[in-house]
Amino acid sequence: MSTSDHSVAPASFAVSVPDVPDAELEADDLDPDQIVSGDPVVTGKVLWESPDGKQLRGIWQITPGVVTDVEANELFVVVSGRATIEVEGGATLEVGPGSACVLREGDKTTWTVHETLRKAYHISY
């Protein structure tokens, strides 16, 4: 399924997230101001987008390093890798394979990625 025309994805589908080759993931440039340390690289693939663009489902991957972000409403499951996610004014989340996480819109986070992390996500705006 092509990310350039992900709107044609069926409402119900399955994908083996660990088996999607890195070559099928698209570069997602980080704002240099988000990088705290290291040289992290972000890639991903949108598998489905709602017609109004307010919901996305896909795969996201980041290599080791430390980055900051302001989150959307998101549910994700870590497929591989490890990271520590510090939520400003909130919890510190240690995540690894099988971790299911919820982030709220507006959460300010710092991601310390220890091992290249891949997740399957659902985001709503």
Locate predicted features:
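A short, N-terminal "cap"/entry segment at the start of jelly-roll beta-barrel domains
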Residues: M1-K54
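Residue-level recognition of conserved beta-strand positions in structured domain cores
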Residues: I59, E71, V87-G89, V113, ...
